[in-house]
A protein has these predicted regions:
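Residues that define the transmembrane beta-barrel architecture of outer-membrane proteins
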Residues: 30, 52-56, 89-93, 108, ...
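Short glycine/proline- and aromatic-enriched beta-strand/turn motifs that initiate or cap beta-hairpins
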Residues: 24-78
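Outer-membrane beta-barrel translocator domains and adjoining extracellular loop/strand segments
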Residues: 44-51, 77-91, 122-130, 151
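Cleavable N-terminal export/targeting peptides
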Residues: 1-31
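Repeated loop/turn-to-beta-strand initiation elements of outer-membrane beta-barrel proteins
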Residues: 32, 66-72, 104-110, 143-148
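Surface-exposed, well-ordered secondary-structure segments
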Residues: 53, 62-64, 107, 117-123, ...
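Transmembrane beta-strands of outer-membrane beta-barrel pores
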Residues: 38-44, 64, 74-78, 101, ...
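Mid-chain, structured segments of secreted extracytoplasmic proteins
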Residues: 73-115
Length: 153
């Protein structure tokens, strides 16, 4: 009888130990993602940025479970050269960060942040830089949102 009890105790201990070995690690509060796309044209706020030509775009994003996020994104553009503003400049490089959270436990959310649009390259004489800062605020529900952006320039 003692042998059976010991065997049962050993079997139960082994079962518990093996289930602990397969336990899932806690989810990280950090998320890093990347994206890339090839498009037929880059249109921003109703204005073509590539004059009807294809676009290659991509970026990296970091998000923390607290709601804080940072990212960078880039795309080819042609409008700087098309309008004679810059020489040999075909890149838009954006840097952004903000805070996004839900209202309580609902599906409604808000997003507050800033974005810097950077256009590297040499400007022609007398041309004002196309680089600009924006502040934005968005309200949304699940997959739909409305966003208001304000340029600081």
């Amino acid at each position: 009888m003692k042998t059976t009890a010991r065997f049962g105790l050993a079997l139960a201990s082994a079962a518990l130990a093996s289930s602990a070995a397969f336990a899932q690690a806690p989810a990280s509060p950090h998320t890093v993602t990347a994206n890339v796309s090839l498009g037929s044209e880059y249109i921003f706020r109703g204005i073509s940025q590539t004059a009807g030509k294809p676009t290659l775009q991509g970026g990296f994003d970091y998000a923390h479970s607290s709601g804080v996020y940072l990212g960078t994104w880039g795309s080819n553009v042609s409008w700087l050269e098309d309008f004679g503003a810059y020489n040999r400049s075909s890149l838009e490089w954006d840097f952004y960060g903000g805070y996004k959270a839900n209202f309580g436990s609902s599906d409604f959310f808000y997003d507050l942040g800033t974005i810097y649009y950077y256009y590297p390259g040499s400007k022609n004489p007398g041309v004002v830089s196309a680089d600009s800062w924006e502040l934005y605020a968005a309200l949304g529900w699940k997959w739909v949102s409305a966003k208001l952006s304000y340029s600081l320039d």
